């Protein structure tokens, strides 16, 4: 999750250097002092930068290990998992600020609960370009972002949408929605966020409503595109069925649904069992596979034929367009996860 500070225009000195030139009685002495101070700052920053880079590399390496997802994480209590993530990333956030690498308008890394995103802003832009390419999103589109998190896609919306377009994001994690409401505002007053009080064993254990009973707070045929980034990878079959039905309801005719999954096919199963990928689902439950019986919502993969049946049931195109990802060890792919794009018939 590397972020760089905006480069300083040529010829403009840092404030500290400018003050030395303006107030020093002897310009040569002032320049010497300024050089010494710059050298001290660089000397102090270098080990800090190395430490932060090492911490980031370690985190990304862990997220690429199948045993980390399928063995270690399920063994830890949910509260401890979330505390450890914050404890690990909070010093990285502090170091970013000291190094001048934190970008205003982006959430602290310790508050990002949506997986192994290296560059949050760049990830949002790439996601937008992907849905423009595969789902036909344009600046006038009405977009529904199911499971918007801390705004990975939403941060790209203010510069993308025109006055005719609109964005609605909802999520079940209160902290994510609160951050989005405070920090993401569009010029046309057409970007909105909603907290869904929906239960999930991993992401919202205090939620009062079951996802299988949840009705999206939107009118019929309100959206051109619905986007779900790594949402169904944490939802059980009965809940996926409900959400797909609700998405079909709120999509306009010929609207597109773009969702990411881990899809079990003969190819992905062979690669996964050979240890080629960074995800491993060891429990086969027929329609779906899971990391852990203890906390199924940590990671769920779906059988391709099962997904196609749900899509067909709710009036979405079958077969949908599937862009297989790299999670199981494929050398190439549109994304790490599999991306499925379907049209409302």
How should these model regions be labeled?
Residues 162, 235-236, 251-252:
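Helix-to-beta-strand junctions that scaffold the AdoMet/dcAdoMet cofactor pocket
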Residues 241-253:
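A short glycine-rich, Lys/Arg-flanked "PGG" loop and its adjoining helix->strand segment in the class I
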Residues 140-149:
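Conserved class I S-adenosyl-L-methionine
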Residues 230-231:
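Short catalytic micro-motifs in class I SAM-dependent methyltransferases
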Residues 41-134, 150-157, 166-215, 256-345:
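Class I (Rossmann-like) S-adenosyl-L-methionine-dependent methyltransferase catalytic domain
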